[in-house]
Amino acid sequence: MEFSVKSGSPEKQRSACIVVGVFEPRRLTSVAEQLDEISGGYLSNLLRRGDLEGKPGQMLLLHHVPNVLSERVLLVGCGKERELDERQYKQIISKTIKTLNETGSMEAVCFLSELHVKGRDTYWRVRQAVEATQDSLYTFLQLKTKKGEPRRPLRKMVFNVPTRRELTIGERAVEHGLAVSLGSKTTRDVANMPPNICNPMYLFEQAKALEAEYENLHVDSVNEKQMDALGMHSYLAVGRGSVNESIMTIMEHKGGPADQAPIVLVGKGLTFDSGGISIKPGEAMDEMKYDMGGAAGVLGAMHTISALNLPINVVGILAGCENMPDANAYRPGDILTTMSGQTVEVLNTDAEGRLVLCDALTYVERFDPELVIDVATLTGACVIALGHHATGVFSNHNPLAHELVNASEQSGDKAWRMPLWDEYQDQLESPFADMTNLGGRPAGSITAACFLSRFTRKYNWAHMDIAGTAWVGGKEKGSTGRPVPMLSQFLMNRAGIESED
């Protein structure tokens, strides 16, 4: 897919299709009015006849509009002008792209990027349009024998900006949007792979493939024998029931000075979670291939920052593991000694992600990090609390939490800060060990974060629970690519990347 920006009037555009908006009720945007004028009132006559009301997402594809150089004009309903917000804008762009792709318009000039969106500028509108386009066109066809692709798919999009002085901003937005989309696609491709293909070794191989592509990226791994020597017995216990070896992949992006403390991202990489001995119900268990969504998100974010070659140092950890029932599997009642030396009583083997992450979070102390962010499909409780719209953010450092929430607002990849109060720590008490791996039903996402917080006392840390946002079920089942946009924005902010650079 090719993207570009230009600044010009619609009547001078020669393309397969021009895309312009119509507000509700039946009111042409200023750009559409220019086309209406040169066509002798052709568009306004259609609206008077009631062919298009202008409701959000309505589409009307016109062929051979009088005096218009382009073959087609796509009228897009944008709703009420004063009510156009971020969510509606992205939905309109997505539906527009799907319509263009399905109707044989191989290229188009889109003027929707000139629409006024509350509190958003040209950079945001163009970048979100690029990301929404790539998201709308995403397919996972690698394992299908019949691909079912459109005969004449959309191949080129031009987004118009209001003035020539905004061309540089628009070009920057395209560059950033493409890099974020690249990372999101990597995340989705890896997460959508079935667990008989995507195992911990597969995660490592995908990281190595990126290493071959980018000069500043170095990839290494820690195998089970090395984990044992390091005392990572909690991590090892989770994978004991699987024939697939646990592998922790280490990705290092070295874009900053050698003495710059790195930002560390740690992704939970349970490539399949059966629940272990505390086995899950059969319904929707297939979706537990997405329990490596945290690792997939970190892999995608590392792809984005490598593509942008951000001038900072970032370490990405993919904590690969598989939780299966077996004669060798760990059991409820077991007491595990973690890499930190703290002991954990296992109450439920399906609360395994935190047992993998706690050792990974201890391991990363060796990098003397500026900060650490772990990303995990950790708890169903977070889905109950926040649904499928927002990622839960927990942190032991207020400025870091604010930075992450700010990045979520900038990127449109929504997040909400959750409490991490000492009162919740009491729910983890054990009569036999330093703590249990389960805090009971109340506040399940918070007690899981409290568990992790006991292994992060040596650095500033945030935990992102993406259980509700990493994938969707049902007819449109698949990975969402989140939280790559949010993580990428956070890292771009840290690198001092601005829209005008």
Swiss-Prot record:
Positions with a binding annotation for Mn(2+) 1: 273, 350, 352
GO molecular function list: manganese ion binding; metalloaminopeptidase activity
Active site residues of this protein: 280, 354
Gene3D superfamilies, sorted: Leucine Aminopeptidase, subunit E, domain 1, Zn peptidases
InterPro entries the UniProt entry points to: Leucine_aapep/pepB, Macro_dom-like, Peptidase_M17_C, Peptidase_M17_leu_NH2_pept, Peptidase_M17_N
UniProt keywords, alphabetically: Aminopeptidase, Cytoplasm, Hydrolase, Manganese, Metal-binding, Protease
Record-listed Mn(2+) 2 binding positions: 268, 273, 291, 352
Gene Ontology CC: cytoplasm
Cofactor note: Binds 2 manganese ions per subunit.
BP GO annotations: proteolysis
Enzyme class: hydrolase
Localization per Swiss-Prot or TrEMBL: Cytoplasm
Transmembrane residue ranges: none
CDD domains the UniProt entry points to: Peptidase_M17
SUPFAM superfamilies: Macro domain-like (SSF52949), Zn-dependent exopeptidases (SSF53187)
Enzyme Commission code: 3.4.11.1, 3.4.11.10
Cofactor: Mn(2+)
Annotated catalysed reactions: Release of an N-terminal amino acid, Xaa-|-Yaa-, in which Xaa is preferably Leu, but may be other amino acids including Pro although not Arg or Lys, and Yaa may be Pro. Amino acid amides and methyl esters are also readily hydrolyzed, but rates on arylamides are exceedingly low; Release of an N-terminal amino acid, preferentially leucine, but not glutamic or aspartic acids
Disulfide bond found in the keyword field: no
The protein's role, per its UniProt record: Presumably involved in the processing and regular turnover of intracellular proteins. Catalyzes the removal of unsubstituted N-terminal amino acids from various peptides.
Similarity annotation: Belongs to the peptidase M17 family.
Name the UniProt record assigns to this protein: Probable cytosol aminopeptidase
